[in-house]
């Protein structure tokens, strides 16, 4: 992995959950440790997280498609906040980028912020050990 500059890791919401509900802390801590090992070698890591442990699309025809998508986005943000805190407990710096304002817990996604990740090809983010946890941006109908 010494020559790999950047990795994107996709974590489904369902993968984060225990069968009986709640988060699988042992698994998430293990993922955080593995990510830290990669970051410590100088590789930039972006994490995309799903919300499927809370919400799997529109389950009721009485719910508008747009509202169902918004519920999914909120579920994803909850997962991002949780995973971010586990990553921080392992010594990683995190930022949560979302497509809409969500208080001080997240940063609004913008093209400029996305370019920060692209610039990492030229300027290493290694010093900050920055892990960007991005909500999967869904198409709104």
Map each language-model feature to its residues.
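Charged helix-capping and loop-helix junction motifs
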Residues: 24-29, 109-112, 136-141
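Short glycine/serine/threonine-rich phosphate/pyrophosphate-binding segments
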Residues: 17-19, 54-58, 80-81, 130-141
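Ligand-binding beta-strand-loop-alpha-helix segment within the catalytic cores
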Residues: 62-123, 129-130
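Short beta-strand segments
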Residues: 8-12, 49-50, 97, 124-127
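Anion (oxyanion) recognition and catalysis
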Residues: 39-40, 88, 118, 136
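Loop/turn-to-beta-strand initiation segments
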Residues: 42-46, 120-122
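N-terminal glycine-/serine-/threonine-rich phosphate-binding loop
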Residues: 1-44
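Short active-site-proximal "capping" loops at secondary-structure junctions
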Residues: 52-55, 102
């Amino acid at each position: 992995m010494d020559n790999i500059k950047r990795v994107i890791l996709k974590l489904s919401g369902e993968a984060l959950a225990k069968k009986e509900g709640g988060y699988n802390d042992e698994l998430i801590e293990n993922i955080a440790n593995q990510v830290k090992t990669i970051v410590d070698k100088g590789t930039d890591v972006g994490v995309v997280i799903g919300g499927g442990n809370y919400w799997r699309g529109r389950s009721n025809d009485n719910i508008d498609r747009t509202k169902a998508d918004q519920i999914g986005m909120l579920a994803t943000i909850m997962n991002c906040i949780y995973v971010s805190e586990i990553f921080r407990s392992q010594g990683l710096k995190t930022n949560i980028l979302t497509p809409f304002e969500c208080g001080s817990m997240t940063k609004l996604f913008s093209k400029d912020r996305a370019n920060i990740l692209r610039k990492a090809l030229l300027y290493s983010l290694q010093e900050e050990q920055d892990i960007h946890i991005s909500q999967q941006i869904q198409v709104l109908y």
